[in-house]
Amino acid sequence: MPQLLKRLAFQVGSVPNERTTTFTSISNDGHHISLRPLVNLNSTSEEEFPFEWVFAGLNTGVRVVPISEGVVEQDFNFWLDTNCYLNLPNTHRGEVKTIWTQWDSGSVAENGEVFPNGPDNPGVPFFELWHPLDPNRVEQVLLNDPLTTAEATKARSIVFKVREGQGYDGLVIVTGRWAQGFLSKQGDATVDGLNFLRTIELEDGSREALVLYGSDAEKFPQEYLGYESGAHVEVHGLKWDVIESN
């Protein structure tokens, strides 16, 4: 089922915190984007790049293994990753192994370990707490009862992927009213080559951009009605393929 997860807390070390408005979009087929814009900017580097991290992946890059009732292992190899794109020092490379545990409240606890100094050095454990939102609502409504959760499973799920050979990599995932996108210019490796999107469809059918970042952000598709899987769209000279539509 398509999902829109909001992160409630993030912990590395002994003190939990949350400095971002992090949403993760997961399509019906398992493609995913996690967009993590900072709420307050506390340094020059944060002003230059106002995101904790952004990554996106296809369903071929995630492995899900059930552990027990309400517990699964999910191992990720991200296709698009700002840390890798910018070649930031002391950041993890390669597969990220995580354990996800469903809580009675509807929240989901994620536990994992990253290796910012390489796989031969000690890892750094982390904890993230998530809660699914109703993707069909304009407001940020937490899913915590069977009826609204059942309705949320019917949410629209559309995925656009940049066609190869154009000098860009990109993914846009639409879950219900919400859309998130990642677009990067190949061979740039600076913040100038990165573009991000987060929009919400309002009650009157118009779309409001909550995040529209980057000099090429106008190349994101922002109209999502009438597209079937296998369709194509060109936006300001950039061609996108619809790889999923329910």
Curated annotation (Swiss-Prot):
What Pfam families does UniProt report for this protein, alphabetically? HRI1
The record's section on InterPro entries has: Hri1, Hri1_N, Hri1_N_sf
Q: Which domain of life is it from?
A: Eukaryota
Gene Ontology CC: cytoplasm; nucleus
Q: In terms of one coarse class, where is the protein primarily found?
A: cytoplasm
Q: Of which family is this protein a member?
A: Belongs to the HRI1 family.
User: Could you identify this protein by its name?
Assistant: Protein HRI1
The record lists the organism as Zygosaccharomyces rouxii (strain ATCC 2623 / CBS 732 / NBRC 1130 / NCYC 568 / NRRL Y-229)
